[in-house]
Amino acid sequence: MALATNSAAVSGGAAAAASSAPQPRLAATFLPMRRRTVSAVHAADPAKSNGPVQAAAKASSPSTVAAPEKKPVGLGKWTVDSWKAKKALQLPEYPSQEELDSVLKTIETFPPVVFAGEARHLEERLADAAMGRAFVLQGGDCAESFKEFNANNIRDTFRILLQMGAVLMFGGQMPVVKVVGRMAGQFAKPRSDSFEERDGVKLPSYRGDNINGDTFDEKSRVPDPQRMIRAYAQSVATLNLLRAFATGGYAAMQRVTQWNLDFMDHSEQGDRRYRELAHRVDEALGFMTAAGLTVDHPIMTTTDFWTSHECLLLPYEQSLTREDSTSGLFYDCSAHMLWVGERTRQLDGAHVEFLRGVANPLGIKVSDKMNPRDLVKLIEILNPSNKPGRITIITRMGAENMRVKLPHLIRAVRNSGQIVTWITDPMHGNTIKAPCGLKTRPFDSILAEVRAFFDVHDQEGSHPGGIHLEMTGQNVTECIGGSRTVTFDDLSDRYHTHCDPRLNASQSLELAFIIAERLRRRRMRSGVNSNLPLPPLAF
């Protein structure tokens, strides 16, 4: 059996350089603050560093105090395959090393899925969220599948993200960074056990469609490297469709606003505040039209978006890593943003070693098990230059643990002078087993963790920077609760997930309205923008 860690190295010189795409238009910020120029250099490859650089950013709390670049002790020179010298968890064993090497060499010749310039622009937007000037919306499937790949599913999820983004932007009166995570690349999944047993039959666990199949038979569960090529093709096709939706008029603000009005008119959600907000957005657009402000301007008909996924299958990620011709830095061109999961974030592990050398914005999944000192060390390894926007901390720990554990993490990061973006994943800490045996997540528990996240940041004087959701635009019955109540008895009606339960379209939008109200109250308390009549036009 050949370990995936033994795959052939990708030569940085042989890989095609990913040219930086033209920078997308920056959404205008309306916050009454003068944005200070951020001066920081992130040395993705330590060899390219010109020495310590001071990162300067506008400080709204002690957590934004920059620190000089420090090279953590024990780190050697980074290369695209230096991760192979480290212990790699959660990687499959392929039966044929020769076939694996052949597939990886083929992927090396493929064009990049995304461009370096787009990733840099996302980093700038995430830096805004770190400073409280934007809010991140990250959402999508638990795990993409080959079987359910079709244009309608992609469209429906993107549509809900657009609706949520409009609601959050109006409520928070700030730009919303739509990181369309878990799309165009979110296939691989970490597993608690390497094997699964049913009725006395023991087989390798299902690890995602880019590794093996979910059918419980011996042939399907054998890791197949050819699946990586199919995953690449599906990622490119998905991103191509998303780009068309984002720039072809589908994302127009008037259209999105009408969707939200229709949702309120045809839903059982009778909360007057939600209806009020939806109608206020519509009235704002009507005022603009009456004042002669065109709603056909590109700023009103298009939207920026980015993709992200968990960096898990390292041979695949390495094969799509390219040296950017404009900066000389290496980018993992499989997605704009990557995150390291709870099971693979070891300080001396292969996944951290790989990620410290790519210049993409990075996420770190953090549970209640995270030691504050270890978090500070991990951030030092991944962001030695302390560059704003480089690191996003994604907390996932349940409401009660959030109130106890998160303050210590925030204080440790603040005291170290590290600049990060804090967002909450209220899904993974709230998974339970229903009486019927299916996994589910109660909407009330998800909401409780979101509220705890905001409460803690209010208490600590830090910025709640965003939310990370497993969700779909389909009318599934996988999470119980919500105003259109899904009960335990309803779960089997439309339970389609290949992995973990997702919020359906109604539950996702309901959560967005609740968060928007919380953002509005936070804004009114702080006095920021309380005298401004309209939100920014871009979303």
Curated annotation (Swiss-Prot):
Residues 7-21 have a biased composition (Low complexity). Its main location: plastid. It holds the Pfam family DAHP_synth_2. One of its GO terms (molecular function) is 3-deoxy-7-phosphoheptulonate synthase activity. Pathway: Metabolic intermediate biosynthesis; chorismate biosynthesis; chorismate from D-erythrose 4-phosphate and phosphoenolpyruvate: step 1/7. Residues 1-54 form a transit peptide. It is found in: Plastid, Chloroplast. Residues 1-23, 41-70 are annotated as: Disordered. Its EC number is 2.5.1.54. It is an enzyme of class 2 (transferase). Belongs to the class-II DAHP synthase family. This is Phospho-2-dehydro-3-deoxyheptonate aldolase 2, chloroplastic. The gene is DAHPS2.
